[in-house]
Amino acid sequence: TSVQIYYKHPAFPNNQKNTVQYMVQNYMISMACRMLNGRLSEMTQVANPPFINAGVGHSDFLLSKTTTAFTGSVTCKENEIPSSFTTLMREIERAKKFGFTASEYERAKANYLTSVESAYSERNKIKNGSYVNAYVRHFIDNEPIAGLEVEYPIAKQIAAQIPVEAINQVIPQLITKENIVMTIFGPDKEGVTYPSEQELLDIIKNVQTEELTAYVDKVSNEPLLSEEPTGGKIVKTEKGVFGSTVLTLSNGIRVIMKPTEFKADQIQLQAVSPGGTSVFGTEDVEQIRLLNNIAGLGGYGKFSLIELSKVLAGKKVSMGTSVGTLTENVSGSCSPKDFETMMQLI
């Protein structure tokens, strides 16, 4: 079951899209949505979350090309629409009244700059399909196609010059009292009830009169590793197949390195050790079935999943673990500049 609320606005004029003003508006709205989505995502990590999923965004209103909309959406269990929708509207109202914190903005800005920097680094590896999509959007909607060589320095300049105070003015401009559309999607079956239009409007009105408090951003300044591990040594170097290099470390680990030109801003890693679920006893069969699903929810060391995402803000790095029948596996990828962070996560 899901509920959507749309706050409609006139679309940015097509004949003015080829301006820095258009890039500035897109940046500011994107930052506001990114930070609000971060708050909503945090709420799904608690023991009894108020909804299954929730998020906000800004795009064309359905199929319209002359109207855009700031959209809030929440997915919830059957018959829990009132409470879930109330929570969504409360967080939107909180952002409208108090804005975002400086630390939230620094993380959002760091992640944004990392993404545009990565795109710029990979500009010579862009697939033809991406060019086709860009040209179609330019032809239909007059979206700019200046190219990354032009857009990248402008994007960095915009991010450097716009403070969080300016971003905090975005949500109040998008949340209006008129031109609101709400939709509900859910199963048509016995026992499932849905709120009326007036009930949804009453929820919005009640939230607006609540005495809300500002969001508190809890950030840890602790490093990923509390202490540096003792370094090992390379005891053997040899040539491998297909132009690879094989290193044998003092702890017995074999490292196979293979340089490629597929991507300019990515290092991929795959680590495997023998063992897997085959070494568990039969009494652990039920737990083993859930092992891989649960492993990714536990964060890292003393950092919860929420805290870890904040610590890794601005870094292009991902890491995952899995247990197969005969092996334990670690996989990851990162930008070359974040290689040390990836190794710390391992």
Name each model-derived stretch:
Residues 20-31, 163-166, 171, 279:
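PPIase-associated folding chaperone regions across multiple families
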Residues 38, 57, 164-170, 241, ...:
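Short alpha-helical segments and helix-capping/turn motifs at coil-helix boundaries
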Residues 31, 35-36, 73:
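Noncatalytic, helix-rich "gating/capping" subdomain that lines the substrate-entry/channel surface
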Residues 243-259:
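Mature N-terminal segment immediately following signal peptide/propeptide cleavage
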Residues 106-239, 244-248:
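C-terminal regions of mature proteins
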Residues 2-20, 40-161, 179-186, 256-258, ...:
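M16 family metallopeptidases and their MPP-like homologs
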Residues 3, 12, 23-25, 29-33, ...:
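Long, His/Glu/Asp-enriched segments that create or flank divalent metal/ion-associated functional microenvironments
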Residues 30, 88, 167, 252, ...:
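Divalent metal-coordination and catalytic microenvironments
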